Amino acid sequence: IAENNQRASWEDLRRGVNGIVNKVNVDNLAALLPELFALNLIRGRGLLCQSIVRAQMAAPDLGPIFAATVAIINTKLPALGLLLLGRVLKRLRRALKRSDTKTSSGLAQFLAHLINQKVAHEILGLQFILLLLNDQGDSLPPSDTNIETAASFLTACGHLLLQVAPQGVHLVPVIG
């Protein structure tokens, strides 16, 4: 009986998290955050991260809204922001290895928005660009996927990087 109760409460938590994340937009973010914090986010931290990444990939134009949501949650539960960042980076690395331009570009955009919202440090952004453009130590030029991903990433957070770490941005190699 206790196992059935746990399973039922887990399903309720999953439905609650997914329902709230899927409703998030510019107009109702402030109204949905108290609902989200009313849920057991410690227990459902993995669910929340998975739901946010999935929703962001389905609607990339809402990336800044999801990043703002994560930034607000990160102020109360920093471990959750760290978990989401780790998951985004793992998925991004997998997408780059598979040369999946659509996924890597979408995740790079989300990473850029997380940097813009101060969930991730700008040095991570600079390291990411250098990783993309230096192509793992061999003498071959970076792949087209890496160049496209770096361009979309810089488009999204280049302004902040130039303001906060201009010397780091000038270290980015010029391709051509």
Positions of predicted regions on the chain:
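Long, low-complexity, highly charged intrinsically disordered regions
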Residues: 1-68, 72-86
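Flexible helix-coil junctions and inter-repeat linker/turn elements that act as hinges
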Residues: 37-42, 58-62, 73-83, 94-101, ...
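Hydrophobic core segments within long, regular secondary-structure runs in both alpha-
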Residues: 49, 70, 82-93, 108-111, ...
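Extended alpha-helical scaffolding segments
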Residues: 122-176
